[in-house]
Amino acid sequence: DEVLTSLLNLCTPLEPFDMPLLDAHGATLSEDIYAGERLVMKSGSRIRSTQIGLAASIGLDHLPTRPHPRVVVISAGPDLVEPGLNLTGDEEYETNSWLLTTAVRETGAVAYRVHSIPENEDQLKDAIEDQLVRADLVIISGERHDDSFDLITRTLKQLGEITEVEIAIDSSGRHNFGTIGPDKVPVVTLPGDPIAAYISFELLVRPMIRTMLGASTIHRPSVKARLEKGLSSTSGVRSYIRGVLSEDGKSVTPLGSQDEQATLSDANAFIAVPEGDADVAAGAEVTVVVLERRYI
């Protein structure tokens, strides 16, 4: 919670401006909209097709919006290889920039994936500095085994003020955050492991982007559900177990093989297990973070 608070302190809603109706689709409304004296759209809501139609029906051709934040996503490390190429030795396919770029877009921001993979400090510094002109937020991650985390941290400390943090989440990996460049652009380093990176994105980075959007809610919705199958987690830290929430939202089933990346694509929810609950029995009521809105 302290880390999230620090991250949110780096973010402020972007300055609003009027956008043509079609361009406003997917943005966040920055003012209440009235038809005469009747409130028809609330500030902070996401502008969807139905809001576009409503605006047109009351004679509006523009809407006051918060712009989409521009988020730059970079992966760095000498062992990373682009998908489609052959692997040798200790190399691994670069996964996180693809995962995180699309996750950023799903959150409502504009995402820029840096196509080159920096292998040393000079290359990474050049890549970051080249991107700052179009960045409201920078996300960086490294290799699955996190050996490149030190490379990333050293480079970022040349560019700004960086804080390294440990997060009390099971298998969370290494993180840092801060501001870089003359405009003090927020930056977050996520773990190299794709599962850990995605969980951290959902819990930490998504709320940052939603704050920049000026959204009325910055967190995923959560519900209480009955656990269909017992589970075990690491005592002393929070765990977010990938699971499948039932269509009616009343029960949730944890997926097997939690160390496999396939659980990310198979899950529609995280089962949030508090620090003190190492084992949770079937039938217990648990808190479920809903990842797909159609399930609530």
Spell out what each predicted region is.
Residues 17, 21-22, 26, 31, ...:
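Flexible glycine/proline-rich
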Residues 1-118, 254, 270, 287-296:
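Short, glycine/charged-enriched hinge/interface segments at domain edges or termini
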Residues 50, 123, 222:
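Short, conserved clusters of charged catalytic residues that mark active-site
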Residues 36, 43, 59-65, 128-129, ...:
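A generic local secondary-structure boundary/capping motif
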Residues 31-38, 74, 142-143, 147, ...:
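Structured N-terminal alpha/beta-domain signature
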Residues 1, 65-190, 194-199:
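Helix-rich terminal scaffold detector
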